Amino acid sequence: MPYERLKNARRVVVKVGSNVVTAHNSLNTNAIQSITYQICMLIDRGLEVLLVSSGALAAGLRRLGLDRRPDEIPQRQAIAAVGQSGLIKAYEAAFGGWNALLTWKVVPIINENDTVMVEEIKLGDNDNLSAMIALLMDADFLINLTDIDGLYTKDPRRWPDAELIPEVSVFKKEIETFASSIPGALGTGGMLSKIRAAKKVTSAGVPMIIAKGDKPDILIRLMDGEKHGTYFVPKSERMASRKCWIAYTLKPKGRLILDDGAVQALIHHGKSLLPIGIVDVEGEFDVGAAVEFADTAQEKLGIGLVNYTASDIRAIKGLKTLQIKERLGFKPYDEVIHRDNLVVTPP
């Protein structure tokens, strides 16, 4: 049974949404106390817990008397700065009450709403961040706590006939359609960003659960194997940390368009990418850059680290490996992307 796997977990990432830790124009200290208590109970069992907490931006908005998140980056930075200190202080105070259980233990508290790193706020959200942390830290599970019970067929806050989807094993288009109908409130995510996070971790072999954060002892009950929320089934094979890093943390600097033969070789046979299978090169990049590859219909298939510059790949595209030195005057590698540096990602 899927939930039984939680009993054997040794390291979990817990992501807590804005609507779980904020209420009535301020931080919800009762919710934070409950979450920290549960984390302490899990640590006392021998688990390692990494906490990704939203709430800084929402806490700042409410503290300043604002009811919507502005689009302008400087304003979002200022609001996050106002809320971040209060959020961390609240967690510090809550964890301080459980020192007997946390003797010399550390719970990393991670938040994407940084006041300095513009790109972090501009492009990221804590759902995506929690997925990256789960992959890079070799977590056994990602638990995403929000203000509804899981993924529904439509927004249950508006539609009484909405049905909970207890398990997702295949990401059909209708899954994103369901998620798109369930927006977030003050947070940056909403259900769609959670589904995208689930795609990432499950494709790398890590299961994820979306559950209601204010259910009594929800973390403890999940770790005891109880069924709650929506369970996202992982692929059976675990992706290596290095490939997770390539697939989900590096920004692509360009794109390679591949013919059908190369697509089949990479996706179905786990081969390296050779120049003969490349039909076009987009962008400018150097050796070692992360570059996407796609089919002739421009559908992204994956990402990898290139052994040649963009200009060199343009010169050798469509050629056999034996012709590389003849065209360039040198041949450090047979492959444009070696299979060890290549990751096929889900659509």
List the model feature ranges, each with a label.
Residues 1-69, 73-347:
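C-terminal catalytic "cap/lid" subdomain
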